[in-house]
Amino acid sequence: MRPLGSLVPEPARAAIEQAAALIAQVGRPNVRMQFDFYHAQIEGGDLSTRFARHHAVIGHVQVAAVPSRAEPDEGEVSYPAIFDMLDRNDYAGFVGCEYRPRRRTEDGLGWARSYGIGVG
């Protein structure tokens, strides 16, 4: 389930807290939340607290710079701190990147190299 908040006009949108409540109500281990750090920051911030509160139902996270939605190496969110927080919470789900590259995708992967992620 992907909660996008009120900024995205979509019938299935929901706030993180609403999505977590719905997942708890469904009660199925294969229904998980996608926690998009970009949308969570836009919709109120407090990222570490909100992630920790709903960690048990999060199976996928997404990263992007706020507010530019470019590579996650600029802006309001400190992704080194976010990735440290994911490690401290023993997060074992997926990490996705949904952003608009400033140039070619390959040129913008410098941020990922510091985490041991490379191209080719």
Where are each of the predicted segments found?
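Short beta-strand segments at enzyme active-site cores
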Residues: 1-3, 96
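Histidine-acidic metal/acid-base catalytic patches
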Residues: 13-120
